[in-house]
Design a protein with these regions (language model features):
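Non-catalytic structural scaffold of enzyme domains
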Residues: 1-168
Length: 168
């Protein structure tokens, strides 16, 4: 969810790194391209050429700066995963696949996985495909509840506010 997701990711890397001094932390290059066009809009309209070019340029920039792999903290951007991966020689971590794999391996006999995401992510079915590939049933919110999820993401979190938990 924009800069918030990047911040959360970085905080988690720090929290899970065993380090007693600065030099023991993981070297990272952070790229927050806040002016990136809206991914959901690009998926819905099919007008995605400019967005794909920007995503691939960012990936090549990270590679040039010495990154050994790339983590994209935006679920919706993973709709363009193949384009991004094809633009670089280093691995791009597929957050969708990793998330589904985590759920399947973390919880014994999991049969269903709930998906709360933008309309672009839901509409693209990227989580649905990963769930089915892993042998679990994807579950998405009703249209009414999906509107609440979108409001939480766009009106709250992307606007720099803390999420309204009452919407859930």
């Amino acid at each position: 969810m924009g800069p918030e997701a990047s911040c959360y990711f970085y905080e988690n890397v720090i929290a899970h790194t065993k380090a007693e001094k600065d030099q023991e932390h993981i070297d990272m290059v952070l790229l927050s391209h806040a002016s990136m066009p809206d991914r959901t809009k690009a998926i819905r309209t099919g007008d995605d050429t400019h967005l794909i070019n920007l995503l691939c340029t960012d990936a090549r920039t990270l590679e040039t700066l010495g990154a050994s792999n790339i983590a994209i903290t935006c679920n919706t951007s993973h709709y363009f995963y193949k384009h991004i991966q094809n633009a670089v020689k280093i691995p791009v971590i597929n957050m969708i696949q990793e998330s589904v794999n985590y759920a399947v391996h973390k919880y014994d006999n999991v049969k269903r996985v709930g998906i709360m995401a933008t309309d672009g992510t839901i509409g693209s079915k990227i989580y649905h495909k990963a769930c089915r590939k892993a042998g679990v049933t994807p579950v998405q919110p009703s249209e009414e509840r999906q509107a609440d999820v979108m409001s939480l993401i766009y009106d709250d979190i992307k606007a720099g506010k803390s999420g309204d938990r009452a919407k859930f």
